[in-house]
Amino acid sequence: MFVLPRYRLSSRLRECDDAPLLLYYKGNADLNRTHVINMVGTRHCTEYGKDICRRFVDELATLCPDVLVVSGLAYGIDIHSHRAALDNGLDTVGVLAHGLDQIYPRLHRDTAIQMTSQGGLLTEFMSRTNADKVNFVRRNRIVAGMADAPSWWNRPKRAAH
């Protein structure tokens, strides 16, 4: 595990007004890649949404094999984009809403372990910090701040534009 002070954060994230002062990081991915895409969407994705997500990452791996895929390790589009990236040999970083000493949801533990050697896990929360509703909102600003543009997949109808 590394502690990344503000000056070592990804250059994109440092430009955000509300960038965290430090991040805890476990992994090997370069957070300052030329190409970084975030993939976020509903936790209750459809089969069509999963398929489109998979096909997009398959194509992305061919066109831009050095891209870093960033998401939140949550149910739905998040976990499907992480797994698609791993399956295509792409690095993927999961931004957590809790400390690095736990994985939430537990069902994603095996994927998270694989990500530490093919990407990484990143959080602003100290160990023993539990997943809490407000932490997910704080996590989302990091996911958004790490990429050049947001990427919404299978967005729920009630999501903000």
Annotate the PLM regions.
Residues 3-161:
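Glycine-biased, small-residue-rich flexible motifs in mid-sequence functional cores and linkers
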